[in-house]
Regions:
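Acidic/histidine-enriched, glycine/proline-rich intrinsically disordered or flexible terminal extensions
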Residues: 103-135
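Active-site beta-strand termini and strand-to-loop segments that position acidic
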Residues: 21-25, 92-97
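Amphipathic N-proximal alpha-helical interface segments
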Residues: 27-38, 105-108
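Core segments of cupin and vicinal oxygen chelate
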Residues: 1-28, 65-86, 124, 130-135
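Vicinal oxygen chelate
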Residues: 17-25, 43-64
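Short terminal or interdomain "cap/linker" segment that borders an active site or interface and mediates
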Residues: 90, 96-98, 117-122
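A short, acidic/glycine-rich surface segment
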Residues: 6-7, 38-43
């Protein structure tokens, strides 16, 4: 199965590099690498857990309602950000049972294609070159 490069940035403002690929049927995979900020969340994650899955994202129609539902069910929600209607997000804290994968819940007023057009920052080779400097 081949993925198609959709968007990426060699040093996103959040302090990390990313490349996102889409697959037939609608699935996407986003690869993260540390950016120029040595105190960024990707660096901290790698120091604590090593390489692996950081988070899974589920897109919902109403983020505020979903966050309320999650809290009412006993989930610990953090990192809520409602400041940009193009991408609002919250995270569910992993349990204390050893799981290290975060769950991201997100809402957008844009289609995936509109996000790709808005967020495409750099060609894939520039993103990969930036990411390999941390090997």
């Amino acid at each position: 199965m081949l993925g198609e490069y959709r968007q990426g940035d060699a040093d996103w403002s959040g302090g990390f590099a990313f490349a996102q690929f889409s697959f037939p049927g609608g699935g996407r995979v986003e690869l993260l690498a540390p950016g120029n900020d040595p105190s960024g969340f990707v660096v901290k994650f790698l120091e604590r857990h090593g390489e692996g899955v950081h988070h899974l994202t589920f897109v919902v129609d109403d983020l505020r309602a979903e966050v309320q539902r999650l809290r009412e069910s006993g989930q610990r929600v953090f990192g809520e950000n409602y400041s940009n209607s193009h991408w609002m997000e919250a995270f569910i804290s992993p349990g204390l049972d050893g799981s290290r994968v975060l769950i991201q819940v997100a809402q957008s007023d844009q289609t995936s294609e509109q996000q790709d057009d808005d967020w495409r920052r750099h060609p894939l080779d520039a993103v990969l070159k930036a990411a390999t400097r941390f090997r």
